[in-house]
Amino acid sequence: MDSSAGPGNISDCSDPLAPASCSPAPGSWLNLSHVDGNQSDPCGPNRTGLGGSHSLCPQTGSPSMVTAITIMALYSIVCVVGLFGNFLVMYVIVRYTKMKTATNIYIFNLALADALATSTLPFQSVNYLMGTWPFGNILCKIVISIDYYNMFTSIFTLCTMSVDRYIAVCHPVKALDFRTPRNAKIVNVCNWILSSAIGLPVMFMATTKYRQGSIDCTLTFSHPTWYWENLLKICVFIFAFIMPVLIITVCYGLMILRLKSVRMLSGSKEKDRNLRRITRMVLVVVAVFIVCWTPIHIYVIIKALITIPETTFQTVSWHFCIALGYTNSCLNPVLYAFLDENFKRCFREFCIPTSSTIEQQNSARIRQNTREHPSTANTVDRTNHQLENLEAETAPLP
């Protein structure tokens, strides 16, 4: 690292690694990924949470109207679809008893992380348009930490789902004891605790800074800053991408071998069909996650190792990587709707309730009330019976 990367060195806006005095771009406060030395890179937004708080510096010093409209439209679509879809997934899992399986408990955790991530998009959009962070220091800390929490919790949950599928396919007897909703909830809590190992420090490191008339939401590092920034990026690359992807690859490799070598896993064709269907759904969700997140991780690690000159292609590539990462947060509900019959049926019942569905819900409520208040239920039954007798007695004779 040369002297230009020393403490206090700040590059100008012609450099994509320019400081936060440049006009912010979406995800700007989440960017540690473009480091030109000790100064946290303000001109490179980082959706992945690999970055601190700065923005990609447009060549003109401010975004063009077409760029701004395009980014705002994309973020708005992702935000609306992501929030609605993920909250619908969580509602379906909580609402329907049949959906409370171990796999769906993990899906609930994934939907929660994705919903939190998409909830930060309105703040990023305002930051992009205004060229400054107007929401104060507390929200700065919350938004940055949510970004890191989402990244780590999502990949840890997908890792857990892959291991869960491996146990279900390759060790079906052990799966009966291990794969329970209660254990799945405990594992979810553990995933959030593990994610706190990065989420909480980032929350304390996040702060707002005033630079040349604008406010930036950024991460602060001890000296030498360039060392700690690059160390953070490398650790995130290893623990939030390389290792989980290796674990997922091994699990699915073993599952594929098992599925090819054994014609029947459970002794029942119907159970086997469901097992393979769920395994396929989890595999697709994992594959989409890897496709959406690989570009940003590769981009960030390359940026940490070499200097990439500012070009139109570089700017477009960066925004494409960010958009791809955000898009993953709203894709999962769509995948569930197409790949899982139970989710598809529950989504349909929620959006277009039929008379039979309403009757089933009413019957379920009546049964629940009967269990919770047996004396009241008996009183209601007696009252209804008395009313029926009274109506029969007072009815006109034929």
From Swiss-Prot:
InterPro entries (UniProt xref): GPCR_Rhodpsn, GPCR_Rhodpsn_7TM, Mu_opioid_rcpt, Opioid_rcpt
GO biological process: adenylate cyclase-activating dopamine receptor signaling pathway; adenylate cyclase-inhibiting G protein-coupled acetylcholine receptor signaling pathway; adenylate cyclase-inhibiting G protein-coupled receptor signaling pathway; G protein-coupled opioid receptor signaling pathway; locomotory behavior; negative regulation of cytosolic calcium ion concentration; negative regulation of nitric oxide biosynthetic process; negative regulation of Wnt protein secretion
GO function terms (MF aspect): beta-endorphin receptor activity; G protein-coupled opioid receptor activity; G protein-coupled receptor activity; G-protein alpha-subunit binding; morphine receptor activity
Protein's name according to its UniProt entry: Mu-type opioid receptor
UniProt modification remark: Phosphorylated. Differentially phosphorylated in basal and agonist-induced conditions. Agonist-mediated phosphorylation modulates receptor internalization. Phosphorylated by GRK2 in a agonist-dependent manner. Phosphorylation at Tyr-166 requires receptor activation, is dependent on non-receptor protein tyrosine kinase Src and results in a decrease in agonist efficacy by reducing G-protein coupling efficiency. Phosphorylated on tyrosine residues; the phosphorylation is involved in agonist-induced G-protein-independent receptor down-regulation.
Function, as annotated: Receptor for endogenous opioids such as beta-endorphin and endomorphin. Receptor for natural and synthetic opioids including morphine, heroin, DAMGO, fentanyl, etorphine, buprenorphin and methadone. Also activated by enkephalin peptides, such as Met-enkephalin or Met-enkephalin-Arg-Phe, with higher affinity for Met-enkephalin-Arg-Phe.
Subunit structure: Forms homooligomers and heterooligomers with other GPCRs, such as OPRD1, OPRK1, OPRL1, NPFFR2, ADRA2A, SSTR2, CNR1 and CCR5 (probably in dimeric forms). Interacts with heterotrimeric G proteins; interaction with a heterotrimeric complex containing GNAI1, GNB1 and GNG2 stabilizes the active conformation of the receptor and increases its affinity for endomorphin-2, the synthetic opioid peptide DAMGO and for morphinan agonists. Interacts with PPL; the interaction disrupts agonist-mediated G-protein activation. Interacts (via C-terminus) with DNAJB4 (via C-terminus).
Glycosylation sites: 9, 31, 38, 46
Modified residues (Phosphotyrosine): 166
Disruption phenotype: During adult neurogenesis in hippocampus, increased numbers of granule cells maturing into neurons, larger granule cell layers and increased numbers of granule cells.
Organism name: Mus musculus
GO CC terms, sorted: axon; dendrite; endosome; GABA-ergic synapse; membrane; perikaryon; plasma membrane; presynapse
Region feature (Disordered): 362-383
Record keywords, A-Z: Cell membrane, Cell projection, Disulfide bond, Endosome, G-protein coupled receptor, Glycoprotein, Lipoprotein, Membrane, Palmitate, Phosphoprotein, Receptor, Transducer, Transmembrane, Transmembrane helix, Ubl conjugation
Pfam families to which the protein is assigned, alphabetical: 7tm_1
Highest taxon of the lineage: Eukaryota
